[in-house]
């Protein structure tokens, strides 16, 4: 993952190249549930309340891939174009295999962000350490050349206080252990860690790479309580993590994540065993189609319209001569019924040549055919 200094230098270089304050960010969001994604979109909308479209009013899509674009204007005058790709995490599907194709289609000058959304209410926290490490290790394997800043953001983070107050297994000791474990892992993976209780919009803004002012950066950072934790990469240290609980064996865990993950699974209550067989998609994900194959067969559409118009004209000539219709045999009646059936199914076909020409012209203009 890119360091904070590398990300800053890259942003500065891009700004000098474009000679303006426009910033392009390509974000890949990983989350389990569309309700989680919808809540995160509310926070993104809050960065610039005047910007359109409102992501929160759209139907969020995760399977296999959802794609959204949003333009944001910050108070400092930055124009930020967010290209957001949403896919399920690796423990839910194999959509991550599409990542190289997704990143290849992003604007060349855009900075990259990988963001994992976790939900305190809708997910099993006992798997979080394993999931976080697994995702960011796999990202390096799938796309080793990509320099991207990584983040984890916990949504509904105030729910951890509810668990601490109402569940015997969620003691204050367990909460502190989880707090220190998450920050130790984030420090090891060189990623940022956010929550949404205190500064949801600022946390989302930082996670997706929208520039923060100096005052916003000071307001965002919080290292005291798990429900409020917001730690950007480069601002944390082992000494700061040790201040939460001095009994946390940092000297053991900092170089031994296997032991940390094992102890984490023992301390953090498991809600329900994960059935990997039922949640993982075993079918291979088809590669993204060639864009040329997505272009409509306009010539075929035009030929079909002319054929329908010919049938429509024949039908009008026949229906305007009732005496002739009465003399038509049963075979011709069946043929007439076929023509009428075609006409009924496409009543929007114009009745006159000028209207048809107008429709054809509209199709040609829409697809820019010369």
From Swiss-Prot:
The cytoplasmic dynein is composed of at least two heavy chains and a number of intermediate and light chains. It comes from the Eukaryota. Keywords: Cytoplasm, Cytoskeleton, Dynein, Microtubule, Motor protein. Its main location: cytoplasm. This is Cytoplasmic dynein intermediate light chain DYN3. It comes from Kluyveromyces lactis (strain ATCC 8585 / CBS 2359 / DSM 70799 / NBRC 1267 / NRRL Y-1140 / WM37) (Yeast). It is found in: Cytoplasm, Cytoskeleton. GO terms for cellular component: cytoplasm; dynein complex; microtubule. The gene is DYN3. Component of the cytoplasmic dynein which acts as a motor for the intracellular retrograde motility of vesicles and organelles along microtubules. May play an important role in the proper orientation of the mitotic spindle into the budding daughter cell yeast. Probably required for normal progression of the cell cycle. Signal peptide: none annotated. Belongs to the dynein light intermediate chain DYN3 family.
């Amino acid at each position: 993952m890119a360091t904070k200094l590398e990300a800053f230098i890259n942003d500065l270089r891009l700004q000098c190249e474009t000679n303006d304050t426009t910033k392009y960010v390509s974000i890949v969001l990983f989350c389990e549930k569309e309700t989680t994604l919808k809540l995160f979109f509310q926070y993104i909308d809050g960065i610039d309340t005047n910007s359109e479209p409102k992501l929160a009013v759209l139907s969020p899509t995760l399977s296999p891939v959802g794609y959204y674009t949003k333009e944001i204007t910050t108070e400092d005058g930055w124009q930020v174009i967010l290209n957001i790709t949403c896919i399920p995490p690796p423990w839910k599907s194999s959509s991550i295999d599409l990542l190289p194709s997704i990143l290849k289609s992003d604007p060349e000058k855009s900075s990259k962000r990988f963001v994992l959304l976790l939900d305190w209410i809708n997910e099993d926290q006992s798997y979080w350490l394993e999931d976080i490490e697994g995702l960011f290790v796999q990202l390096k394997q799938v796309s080793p050349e990509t320099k991207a800043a990584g983040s984890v953001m916990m949504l509904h983070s105030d729910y951890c206080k509810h668990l601490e107050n109402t569940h015997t297994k969620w003691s204050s000791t367990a909460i502190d252990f989880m707090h220190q474990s998450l920050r130790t892992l984030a420090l090891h993976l060189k990623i940022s860690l956010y929550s949404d209780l205190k500064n949801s919009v600022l946390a989302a803004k930082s996670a997706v790479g929208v520039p923060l002012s100096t005052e916003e950066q000071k307001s965002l950072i919080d290292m005291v309580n798990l429900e409020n934790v917001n730690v950007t990469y480069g601002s944390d240290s082992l000494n700061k993590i040790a201040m939460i609980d001095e009994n946390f064996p940092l000297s053991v865990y900092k170089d031994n994540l296997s032991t940390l993950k094992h102890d984490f699974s023992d301390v953090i209550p498991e809600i329900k065993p994960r059935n990997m067989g039922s949640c993982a998609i075993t079918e291979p994900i088809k590669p993204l189609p060639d864009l040329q194959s997505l272009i409509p067969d306009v010539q075929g559409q035009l030929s079909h319209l002319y054929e329908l118009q010919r049938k429509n004209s024949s039908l009008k000539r026949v229906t305007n001569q009732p005496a002739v219709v009465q003399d038509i045999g049963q075979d011709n009646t069946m043929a007439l019924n076929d023509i009428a059936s075609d006409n009924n199914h496409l009543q929007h076909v114009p009745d006159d040549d000028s209207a048809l020409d107008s429709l054809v012209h509209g199709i040609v203009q829409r697809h820019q055919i010369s």
